[in-house]
Every structure is written in structure tokens, then in C-alpha cells.
Amino acid sequence: MAANPPNCSTWSASIAYTAGAVVVDQGKTYTANWWTQGNEPVTNNGGAGSGQPWTLSSGCSTTPPPPPTPTPPPPTPVPPPPTPTPPPPAGSVTYGPYKDITVSMNWNTNVISTAVTGTLSPVLSVKPAKLKMVTWAFATGACGSETWGGLAPAAVASANVQNFVNAGTKYIISTGGAAGSFTCASDANFETFVNRYASSSLAGIDFDIEAGQSAADIDNLVKRVKASQSKHPGLRWSFTLATLGGNAAQSLGGAGVTTMNAIKSNGLTNYIINLMAMDYGSAIASNCTLNSSGKCDMGRSAIASAQSLHNYWGVPYSRIEITPMIGGNDATDETFSIADVTTLSNWVKANGVSGIHFWSLDRDKDCAPGYASATCNSYGTAGTWGFTNAFISALGL
């Protein structure tokens, strides 16, 4: 067998390759599109947009270049992953703020409600007309016997699903969250869970992984999604992960790394990563992108988190969504402003990012800056529904 040409090693399943790595597999040369391990190039290659980790290339050749040219001719240009995908048409960005259904819930009717306007009212009766999606948060516990802050799942579904259908408003079912975990060890129980909320208005299922799920728990969720997708081809499936927004090449937390590895090891390709672009902690360059005052620039930090996910993990922008926390964050010197809405929305549209959400619907009314509140924005100058409408306008919805 002929030796590999210089700088072209034989592909090995035990080696992790990063974007740009060149290998030889069964006599052909391949270039890595992003981080990959265990995906053999000969059976996992394709051009731009294919979702495959390898591209067949002529980056190194067994044939010496003809004189006088000192280097081989360049390969056919293929846009690398960092190249932004074409922006989606106006109005195609997924947009649905999170609604903690236990906040301002009408416990007599179980109808999802809010007090944003000053009076406890069903969300569907007071939301801005152009807001066409709401993310229900959070179902916790084991799939099939989940609970919503003590409410039985059947009660939540029966009181709200048909109302959303009648109103022509989509909804996403979000699980987990900071205060509770969601687990699922059975495909049958997962189908019970999904079907409970199924309707023409169900847009997708979201897994907010914050509350200490084990690696096995996370792997089970990925397996459930992969098995369920063929039964529910119209749904979106997202994993919501904490992130930093600074200059670190890899910005996800430990649970995020575990989730990305589970997605890759299970071969899941139809998924969305939703980044929690909030609560970065200390204002240092590794945590967030700093402004001229030395504080976290929340719009640019959110963008940096998406760029890191795209560049390090190879996630296409079309499979990334971003969820900032509007107004004051848990760290009192971090404030996501109305100006940040414009900055982030413009970048999302220009780069073909899948969607934007925010935390949370009940916070979209004014109160003075200070510690974060569950029922107002700790910002003070946006007005009632100010952030909701600012995103609608900036995204062209």
C-alpha cells in the first residue's frame, strides 16, 4: 500500500478531528467540516448544506504537482461552515417567548394567564396580535406522568390546547428548567407525553437542561427524540442550554457539552440548539462581550454565544436559536435593552438563525432597574409588551 502524502494521515475512529483537518480514507482525501469523531469519511461526506461532517476534497494528493507550479491546484471552492447561510425570508424566524404557566395562572380554570396588562387575563386575550407563538414552561418529572408546577398534565392540556388552536396561535411544550428536571426512559411513555399536547398548533418540544440531569438522562432524551421524529415529522425539537457569551472557543456549560456529545453519538441530525444568552456572571471577557463601560454588552454577547456554538461544534446557524432574558438579568449589572433587541434581531436575520425566544412573557412590563423580577422587566422604559413588540418589529413579523 502506498504511503499517504505529506500532511494527510489515515482516518482513525479514535481521533477527534476539528474543522479543516485532512485525512485519507480508503484511498480518498476528505476535509473535516467541523468537530467530528467516529464518523467515517467514506460513508459520512457531502457538500455544503448536507449536514455531513466530511467533504471529499483534493486538499492533498498522491500525484506530485506538475512543474513549475509548486503546489497542487486548489480544490473546488466549498463554503466552510462559518460562512453564513442565506437569510430566511421575512417572517420565517421562529419567535415565541417563554411563559412560566405557574406565574399568574388562573388556578380555578387552569387557563394560561398573565397580569402584564395590570389585570389577570388569559394570555390569548391580551397578547399582541402579531405574537403567533408562546412557549409553555415547564413540564417536569417523568414523561407520561409529568407535572406542571403541581398541575396534572391532562388539566393543562384540556384547558389550553383547543384555545390555542381556536386562536390560531402556535405553542411549544418546554420541559425541565432551572427548578426541575425532565426524564424519559421509554419510547412508549414519550409518545404518551407528546400526544397529550398534540394539535395543529403544536410547534415543537423543548428540553431545557439545567437541573442536573445525568449523562444517562440526557442520552435518553436524545434517543427518545430520534425515535419519535418519524411519527411527528412536522415538529421542531430543541435542546435549551446555558452558555457564556465571551471570547472562549467553547462556551457551553457541562450539561451542554454532555448534550452535544449525546446528539453526535446518537446520530441525531434533526435538532435545534437554543442558547440561554443570559446571566453570564462576572463581567470579564471570557464570560461575556464587554462594552466601553466594562459591562456585558448583552446583544453582542448573545451573538458571540451563537458564533461559538457554530464554530466549535459545527452547528449550522439554521439549527441555532437564542433566548435572552429581557431587561435586568440575575446579575444586576447585566441588562438586555431595547437596543439589544435590534442588534440581535438584525444579526439573526442576516445569518439565517432559526429563531429567537425570550425569558419571559410575564416580565414584559416596566418596573425600576434592580434585582430581576418574575413579573416585570427591571428595566423601566420599554412599556407594556415593549420587548414583545420590539422583537416583532425588528424581525419583520
List the predicted regions and their residue ranges.
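Eukaryotic short linear interaction motifs
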Residues: 105-107, 180-182, 214-215, 245-248, ...
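Structural recognition of the beta-strand scaffold that forms the well-ordered cores
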Residues: 23-24, 31-32, 94-100, 131-138, ...
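Sec/Tat signal peptide C-region and signal peptidase I cleavage site
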Residues: 1-2, 86
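Tryptophan-rich substrate-binding surfaces of secreted polymer-degrading and adhesive proteins
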Residues: 2-74, 79
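Acidic glycine-/aspartate-rich tracts in secreted/extracellular proteins
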Residues: 27-47, 139-141, 178-179, 327, ...
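Substrate-binding and catalytic surfaces of secreted/luminal carbohydrate-active proteins
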Residues: 21, 137, 142, 148-151, ...
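Substrate-binding cleft of extracellular glycoside hydrolase catalytic domains
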Residues: 145-269
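N-terminal carbohydrate-binding/catalytic regions of secreted carbohydrate-active enzymes
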Residues: 89-199, 222, 341-355, 361-394
